[in-house]
UniProtKB/Swiss-Prot annotation:
Gene Ontology terms for molecular function: G protein-coupled adenosine receptor activity; G protein-coupled receptor activity
Gene name tied to this protein: ADORA2B
Disulfide bond sites: C78-C171
Organism: Homo sapiens
UniProt xrefs under SMART domains: 7TM_GPCR_Srsx
Family: Belongs to the G-protein coupled receptor 1 family.
Subcellular location: Cell membrane
Lipid attachment residues per UniProt (S-palmitoyl cysteine): C311
TM helices/strands, residue ranges: 9-33, 44-67, 79-101, 122-144, 179-203, 236-259, 268-291
Entry protein name: Adenosine receptor A2b
Cytoplasmic side: 34-43, 102-121, 204-235, 292-332
Length: 332
């Protein structure tokens, strides 16, 4: 089947985003795995975020391409393709929320931080968050789906019979996942509240940090440490802001589709494609932010690329090691 120009451009851009997402986020995982200075509880949550972004490139984007082209498949196969990206999105949101709480504890209760936040606890939290993400993302399999309307409009059965369970449906997102689920449960219930909580947390972090910096009795070492923590919080708040900017357009389109059905039916395909591309492009951004904002990540990225891709000798930093400060706590 020949693709229209618009569809061909969409597929090409999705493939570019997928390649960049996988490459960049595998690099993040490798950096944390190989550099001792990057192995902190905060970065374990960032690895969880990177793992979700790798899965976006490997699975969610190919699934999105399949759905955009409207191939015919059985209902539950199409529903799985549609729901898988919801699992990854929810995992990303939970990982960002965990990072925000982690930074809040680091700045607001610094003396208890190391005893409260350990690597083992961080890994346990990550496991729980992924289980919750799968539960939320796969909720349509419990019945909140469009099976009745989809099978009433099936194209053809698998074996030429009229058996509804074997019915082939045109695999489009809106054919299998109801907008009521996407807006009321997914957006209003599972996306917007964590984003608002993160906004409150980061505002609180900056207020507390600024108040502490104004204390004249603060020792030079404590002041430097606090400035690093503020720098880290700014970097992570930037990641949350970019996430919101990338994902809110597609949720806005879903809201229009649900609350203004007439306009929703007539929405241009290119607008929906652009919103989807923007949401997927978010998976490319985080490694760029890490490299730009953090010396340890930047050095380790350079070291990995030089050693394994360019087959060059190890890169040496000024002191012969991959930075000396905790990740995301180093000023540039």
């Amino acid at each position: 089947m020949l693709l229209e120009t618009q569809d061909a451009l969409y597929v090409a851009l999705e493939l570019v985003i997928a390649a960049l997402s996988v490459a960049g986020n595998v690099l993040v995982c490798a950096a944390v795995g190989t550099a001792n200075t990057l192995q902190t509880p905060t970065n374990y949550f960032l690895v969880s975020l990177a793992a979700a972004d790798v899965a976006v490139g490997l699975f969610a984007i190919p699934f999105a391409i399949t759905i955009s082209l409207g191939f015919c498949t059985d209902f539950y196969g199409c529903l799985f393709l549609a729901c898988f990206v919801l699992v990854l999105t929810q995992s990303s949101i939970f990982s960002l929320l965990a990072v925000a709480v982690d930074r809040y504890l680091a700045i607001c209760v610094p003396l208890r931080y190391k005893s409260l936040v350990t690597g083992t606890r961080a890994r346990g939290v990550i496991a729980v968050l992924w289980v919750l993400a799968f539960g939320i993302g796969l909720t349509p399999f419990l019945g909140w789906n469009s099976k009745d309307s989809a099978t009433n409009n099936c194209t053809e059965p698998w074996d030429g019979t009229t058996n509804e369970s074997c019915c082939l449906v045109k695999c489009l997102f809106e054919n299998v996942v109801p907008m009521s689920y996407m807006v009321y449960f997914n957006f209003f219930g599972c996306v917007l509240p964590p984003l608002l909580i993160m906004l409150v947390i980061y505002i609180k972090i900056f207020l507390v940090a600024c108040r502490q910096l104004q204390r004249t009795e603060l020792m030079d070492h404590s002041r430097t440490t606090l400035q690093r923590e503020i720098h880290a919080a700014k970097s992570l708040a930037m990641i949350v802001g970019i996430f919101a900017l990338c994902w809110l357009p597609v949720h806005a389109v879903n809201c229009v589709t649900l609350f203004q059905p007439a306009q929703g039916k007539n929405k241009p395909k290119w607008a929906m494609n652009m919103a989807i591309l923007l949401s997927h492009a978010n998976s490319v951004v985080n490694p760029i932010v890490y490299a730009y904002r953090n010396r340890d990540f930047r050095y380790t990225f350079h070291k990995i690329i030089s050693r394994y891709l360019l087959c060059q000798a190890d890169v040496k930093s000024g002191n012969g090691q991959a930075g000396v400060q905790p990740a995301l706590g180093v000023g540039l």
